[in-house]
């Protein structure tokens, strides 16, 4: 997934990337990712005059822990990709207004490696708080019972900790 920047732009090269990428290293220290398949990369790379356009999609099947009850959640995620890459200007190492364009990714050097870019896009689109269902009740804060399976016998009365002293005061008067 590497391209020569100048050659791709000057010759107007069009290339199709259709491969599976092993992303195990990205998730090895993450306890919320139970399992995952390979990342399927399907991209069209087009060299234009002065830029390289990358369009397509990333697809992954993974199993994540529900953020409320910790049950496994199987997800099929399709991530649309559409970005433009341009060579960075080399004027004393300072960025010009042209380089500060938010829609363009600056490339330093003559090689464009799309693997780090694809991995970053995957991490940015990873679900922040996956849920097994919209109405997931989560775990009991006192005993840890999964409230989706059954109710626990814990008290649901909540007392503001700042007022707990007053509660004890009224008990003594009775």
Predicted features and spans:
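Structured interface patches
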Residues: 1-174
